[in-house]
């Protein structure tokens, strides 16, 4: 039962983290729809083709899995990276990077 609650809380937090950037993307697109690339650069304070440094959340814990065989069944840390890439008139291609350390 406790495992189910942990999984449910993790899924709810993922939905919460995903909702913020999506709202910002819609606001950005409506604000910049008729702008030139130079106007977008002035609006953003940086070049619109520059990528934004991703935000990073780290889950530290351990769990086991027998899928990978002996010696690879325990994981201690998972990094979840939510990065945003931009082009001339877009904000927010969501990028999910999972790395097991």
What is each PLM-predicted segment?
Residues 14-18:
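C-terminal segment of classical bacterial N-terminal signal peptides
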Residues 5-13:
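Sec-dependent N-terminal signal peptides
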């Amino acid at each position: 039962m406790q495992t189910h609650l942990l999984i449910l809380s993790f899924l709810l937090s993922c939905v919460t983290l995903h909702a913020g950037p999506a709202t910002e993307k819609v606001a950005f697109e409506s604000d910049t729809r008729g702008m030139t690339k130079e106007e977008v650069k002035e609006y953003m304070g940086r070049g619109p083709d520059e990528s934004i440094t991703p935000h990073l959340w780290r889950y530290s814990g351990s769990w086991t899995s027998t899928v990978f065989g002996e010696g690879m069944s325990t994981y201690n840390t998972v990094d979840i990276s939510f990065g945003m890439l931009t082009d001339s008139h877009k904000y927010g291609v969501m990028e999910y990077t999972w790395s097991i350390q």
